[in-house]
């Protein structure tokens, strides 16, 4: 089982806060990807937090039902792990032959992960020579608490499935969203239900990985309280009208003003941190995904606040889909970044 490296024939599973996404692709990076099978099933947000036997059984039934609905036959599965359950960082070690670098990281891992290595599952990939210092090599290091990883493994394999990879969600989502071959750096943002994942890519590799507390649910709570409306109405207002100041008399925008200011400040801090670390390298664009990929006018707001060109990304950019598939996916397409990225692992 691997946290980071490539695998063979499989399907991908992303267990979100309020839905599960499942996808199987054919093809590869060089020739392109083709969507073969997929499923999207809404779930109660309380279910993913329910660790009781009943809760586990119910979630398992939903996963198996989604697999059957999608027509997926393989039992091999790659599973995403939420950023809050993992630790991912870019570290630097003295440059040396790859075998020596591997040994250095392996024997000194306890210096880099925020938990005892005896209690953690640690994996890493050598990114190459640091763009900032040719005497250093950069390493993508990822770790997860053993208890959580083993619990997830047991729950999935109890369904008769074979877990061949577990991967931090931020690493998965950039595989689907990052532009290829650009000369500058790009920040990829996935606004989820309860948190926001942020990755800065440079030279086709992650160089900064972090998670920002707060997601769509925090936006909804603010609008619900400010406008004195029901939760479902607040959610609808945000997703339908977004930050348009000519809709609902700009009440949604005004209600979210302080929350958005703090959100944009976190993005600006990340841009500055990256540009201070990599002297002379600019973050040339921000790509939005998840709910930030569909909230009207949020891209314009972020661009105004950060001074960085911002677009709403398309996680399907490298995947061929039929018109019928596209029609079925339309309402939820932006939520598939992690699942697609997981499914695009095979030729990594």
Regions found by a protein language model. Give the residues of each.
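Adenine-nucleotide phosphate-binding core of ATP-dependent small-molecule kinases
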Residues: 236-285, 292
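Small-residue (GG/TT-enriched) beta-loop-alpha framework at ligand/catalytic clefts
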Residues: 11-19, 23-36, 79, 134-236
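Glycine-rich phosphate-binding loops at beta-strand->alpha-helix junctions
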Residues: 259, 281-311, 317
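Conserved phosphate-binding/catalytic loops in two-lobed NTP-binding clefts
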Residues: 300-339
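Extended, charge-rich low-complexity interaction segments
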Residues: 192-205, 331-348
């Amino acid at each position: 089982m691997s946290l980071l490296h490539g695998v063979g024939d499989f399907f991908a599973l992303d267990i979100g806060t309020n839905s599960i996404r499942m996808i199987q692709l054919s093809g590869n990076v060089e020739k392109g990807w083709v969507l073969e099978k997929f499923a999207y099933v809404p779930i109660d947000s309380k279910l993913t937090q329910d660790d009781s036997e009943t809760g586990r059984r119910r979630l398992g039934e939903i996963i198996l039902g989604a697999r059957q609905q999608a027509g997926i036959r393989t039992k091999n599965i790659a599973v995403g792990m939420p950023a809050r359950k993992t630790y991912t960082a870019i570290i630097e070690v003295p440059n040396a032959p790859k075998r020596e670098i591997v040994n250095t990281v392996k024997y000194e891992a306890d210096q880099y992960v925020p938990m005892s290595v005896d209690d953690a599952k640690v994996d890493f990939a050598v990114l190459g020579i640091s763009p900032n210092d040719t005497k250093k090599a950069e390493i993508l290091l990822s770790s997860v608490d053993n208890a959580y990883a083993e619990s997830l493994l047991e729950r999935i394999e109890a369904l008769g499935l074979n877990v061949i990879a577990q991967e931090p969600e931020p690493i998965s989502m950039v595989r689907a969203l990052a532009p290829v071959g650009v000369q500058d750096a790009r920040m990829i943002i996935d606004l989820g239900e309860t948190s926001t994942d942020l990755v800065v890519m440079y030279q086709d590799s992650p160089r900064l990985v972090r998670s920002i507390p707060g997601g769509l649910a925090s936006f909804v709570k603010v609008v619900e309280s400010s406008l004195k409306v029901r939760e479902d109405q607040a959610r609808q207002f945000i997703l339908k009208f977004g930050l348009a100041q000519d809709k609902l008399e700009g009440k949604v925008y005004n209600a979210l003003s302080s929350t958005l200011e703090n959100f944009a400040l976190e993005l600006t801090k990340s841009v500055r941190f990256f540009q201070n670390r990599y002297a002379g390298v600019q973050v040339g664009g921000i790509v939005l995904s998840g709910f930030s990929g569909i909230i009207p006018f949020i891209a314009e707001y972020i661009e105004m606040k950060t001074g960085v060109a911002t677009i709403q990304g398309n996680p399907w950019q490298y995947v061929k889909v039929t018109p019928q598939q596209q029609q079925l996916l339309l309402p939820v397409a932006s939520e598939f970044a992690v699942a697609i990225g997981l499914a695009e692992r095979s030729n990594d």
